Design a protein with these regions (language model features):
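Consensus positions within tandem repeat domains that build extended binding/scaffold surfaces
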Residues: 129, 150-152, 178-180, 200-203, ...
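Structural signature of tandem-repeat unit edges
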Residues: 2-99, 104, 108-125, 133-147, ...
């Protein structure tokens, strides 16, 4: 069955099964997976998952106890989920995106999310792989953001605009893997804010970059930060770079 047909079937059924390896089934079918993570009546008629463990009625699913970070991430990696509502002592959601409380970080955006995303004020960091594989087209950071972890936006194939805000001072600096915007095919132009001192390794590797503006004051560029950017024909390096 084609992916589009499967998505429509799931929407029509109103239920899904979240399993390992991103395998799912409808209420009339059996899961092909060996290890089922959790079966629940998640209302996805609008690709919206209500997962408040304290809720016992309405359109939200009822769970016995709170969900772990791993369980939440597995749910959000279901490509048919666009929105989640959840709250416990450690995690909460704003506009359908999962955050941690202390420190406040973006933990995971649903893979099925589309359009523009504005990260909540007060957020300090974007966690590892937080937006990886999402279908968002643009993202806006608050000035409170100070760190972006490895692979945060890797393979966001529709991402075409990033507003870094006025707070972040390094983009991928100090990361182990880097690859923050690797595979972002439609990210053609990027303006690095004036306060940024470092761009980490592999940050824009194999992306669609055609033009990038680097500010005076930038001190370090990691290895292969712009590697395999075949459409990037020219780049002007600021004099502030430390050789």
């Amino acid at each position: 069955m084609a992916t589009t047909d499967k998505k429509e079937e799931l929407k029509a059924s109103g239920t899904c099964m979240v399993v390992q390896n991103e395998k799912i089934s409808t209420k009339n079918g059996e899961s092909p997976a060996d290890n089922i993570v959790r079966e629940s009546n998640i209302p996805i008629l609008t690709s919206h998952a209500g997962l408040n463990p304290r809720s016992k009625s309405g359109n939200e699913s009822s769970f016995a106890g709170e969900l772990s970070r791993t369980e939440l991430e597995q749910i959000l990696e279901n490509p048919f989920i666009e929105h989640i509502e959840y709250e416990d002592e450690d995690y909460f959601t704003i506009n359908g995106i999962l955050y941690s409380r202390s420190p406040q970080e973006v933990i995971r955006c649903p893979i099925g999310r589309t359009g523009h995303v504005k990260v909540a004020e007060g957020t300090l960091a974007i966690a590892y792989g937080a937006f990886q594989f999402c279908e968002i087209e643009s993202v806006e950071f608050p000035d409170s953001i100070v760190a972006i972890a490895d692979r945060a936006f890797r393979d966001c194939r529709k991402l075409n605009h990033v507003d870094f805000g006025k707070g972040i001072k390094d983009i991928g600096g100090g990361t182990i893997l880097g690859e923050i915007f690797t595979g972002c095919d439609r990210l053609h132009e990027v303006v690095i804010p004036g306060q940024v001192k470092e761009i980490g390794k592999l940050t824009f590797y194999d992306s669609g970059l055609e033009k990038i503006t680097l500010p005076e004051g930038l001190e370090r560029i990691g290895s292969m930060a712009f590697g395999h950017c075949s459409n990037l024909k020219e780049i002007s390096l600021p004099e502030s770079l430390i050789k």
